[in-house]
């Protein structure tokens, strides 16, 4: 059963078409409203959705997981028209809750995939590319790959909450950074943990 609130709008109890797309992207509701038919791009062998003027007015590129590209492509027709109109959105649907669930799922996915040393190096390379191109505040301060061999350990209330909910409290730091940079457009691990991975 869904953790998300059902909408009072008839036919929009599941969040409508925006929620169908968002299960593959984990965007904020405001970002979904700005998407256009030409917001999908391909760069360095990967697929991204452009979020123009996202939170804080930032330009963002949200990575589409390789396994989800075919489904995401169905929503984009290459035109400059907006993907959704106001009536497509569920009035009481928790799109941000959907974003939290997506963050947990994508972090778990990377944790599993990053057990392969080759995948791990390629993932770090992609993080570095996006970091140096889009992180205006800390472009020159990405840690070396060896830094990410150290796990990110939840502490205090965050650890207690994770244990209570049966979720991991020792995280793969590279998987966490990939989730943060490539999928949430955050640049700090602690923000991602506090806002998405250790919250309900």
Go through each PLM region and give its residues.
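A short, glycine-centered helix-capping/turn motif at helix boundaries
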Residues: 12-15, 21-34, 105, 109-114, ...
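A structural signal for well-ordered alpha-helical segments within the folded catalytic domains
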Residues: 16, 96, 100-104, 175, ...
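Active-site/catalytic core of tyrosine-dependent DNA strand-transfer enzymes
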Residues: 58, 63-158
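Basic, Lys/Arg- and aromatic-enriched nucleic-acid-binding interface segment
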Residues: 2-29, 158-167
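Conserved tyrosine-mediated DNA breakage-rejoining catalytic core shared by Y-recombinases
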Residues: 34-71
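Internal alpha-helical scaffold/solenoid segments in large eukaryotic proteins
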Residues: 6-15, 29, 70, 80-85, ...
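Short functional hotspots where side chains directly engage DNA or cofactors
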Residues: 47-52, 147-200
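A short mid-domain helix/strand-loop element embedded in enzyme catalytic domains
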Residues: 1-5, 11-13, 44-48, 75-76
């Amino acid at each position: 059963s869904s953790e998300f609130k059902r909408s009072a709008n008839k036919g929009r109890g599941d969040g409508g078409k925006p929620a169908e797309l968002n299960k593959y992207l984990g965007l904020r509701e405001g970002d979904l409203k700005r998407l256009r038919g030409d917001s999908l791009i391909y760069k360095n062998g990967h697929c991204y959705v452009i979020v123009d003027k996202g939170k804080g007015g930032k330009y963002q590129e949200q990575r589409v997981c390789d396994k989800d590209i075919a489904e995401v492509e169905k929503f984009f027709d290459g035109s400059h028209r907006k993907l959704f109109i106001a009536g497509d959105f569920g009035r009481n649907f928790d799109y941000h809750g959907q974003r939290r669930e997506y963050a947990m799922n994508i972090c778990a996915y990377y944790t599993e995939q990053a057990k392969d040393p080759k995948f791990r190096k390629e993932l770090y390379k992609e993080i570095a590319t996006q970091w140096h191109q889009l992180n205006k505040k800390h472009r020159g301060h990405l840690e070396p790959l060896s830094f990410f061999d150290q796990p990110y350990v939840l502490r205090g209330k965050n650890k207690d909450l994770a244990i209570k909910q049966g979720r991991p409290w020792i995280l793969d730091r590279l998987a966490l950074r990939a989730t943060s940079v490539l999928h949430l457009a955050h640049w700090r691990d602690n923000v991602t943990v506090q806002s998405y991975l250790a919250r309900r």
